[in-house]
């Protein structure tokens, strides 16, 4: 005798779970006040700027609202010279203004336009990238870091326009300000130790070569 595996109730539960999963993808990124770090990619949408340049205000004010697609788990389009627009909505459910930094953790992107938008109006913007002066970066850092102000009980939209000649990958993360600088200090210490050890190895090998005249050193 064969047992019934999936009755109407089971099918209904399965459909509900699938709907929840779909709704979760591309939804607003809700700020977690105690979280030091939040991943952004799964809440990000994109569209490709084909042909003539899109006017930023047209994109921001919904002139191309039908062209947005969901990114997925990571933003990586390989080697392409196509310009991509990215959009993420950051929701602050608390009654306090929250300060965050949005990091693009890939320092080889040529051109990045950043727009912080509330109620359809551009509140802040920046133009930076690997092909721009280091002083163009909102924060002096090896990656691209943008301060973001999240108003109480409100939604802030972030738009990025990215163009590059190399690998088009845009790893995004939202950090608490103090947590970002703490992680950065640890990263600097780790890199300093690595390069310090590398320098010691080079010096020792150079000294041994001068003493022993062995090419293997």
Model-based region annotation:
Residues 2-12:
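Bacterial N-terminal signal peptides that target proteins for export
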Residues 24-190:
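Soluble non-transmembrane domains of integral membrane proteins
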Residues 13-22:
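Bacterial N-terminal signal peptides
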Residues 1, 18-19, 32, 193, ...:
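Detector for methionine-enriched segments
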Residues 182-217:
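Core alpha-helical transmembrane segments of integral membrane proteins
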């Amino acid at each position: 005798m064969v047992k019934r595996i999936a009755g109407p109730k089971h099918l209904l539960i399965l459909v509900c779970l699938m709907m929840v999963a779909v709704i979760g993808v591309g939804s607003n990124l809700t700020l977690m006040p105690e979280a030091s770090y939040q991943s952004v990619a799964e809440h990000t949408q994109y569209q490709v700027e084909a042909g003539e340049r899109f006017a930023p205000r047209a994109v921001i004010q919904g002139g191309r609202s039908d062209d947005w697609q969901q990114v997925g788990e990571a933003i990586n389009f390989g080697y392409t010279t196509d310009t991509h627009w990215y959009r993420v909505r950051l929701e602050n459910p608390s009654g306090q203004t929250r300060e965050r930094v949005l990091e693009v953790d890939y320092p080889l992107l040529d051109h990045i336009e950043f727009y912080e938008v509330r109620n359809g109006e551009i509140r802040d913007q920046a133009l930076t990238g690997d092909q721009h002066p280091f002083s163009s970066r909102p924060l002096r850092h090896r990656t691209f870091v943008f301060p973001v102000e999240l108003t109480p009980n409100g939604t802030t939209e972030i738009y990025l326009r990215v163009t590059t000649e190399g690998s088009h990958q845009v790893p995004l993360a939202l950090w608490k300000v103090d947590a970002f600088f703490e992680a950065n200090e640890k990263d600097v210490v780790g890199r300093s130790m690595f390069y310090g050890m590398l320098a010691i190895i080079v010096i020792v090998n150079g000294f041994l070569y001068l003493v022993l005249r062995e090419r293997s050193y």
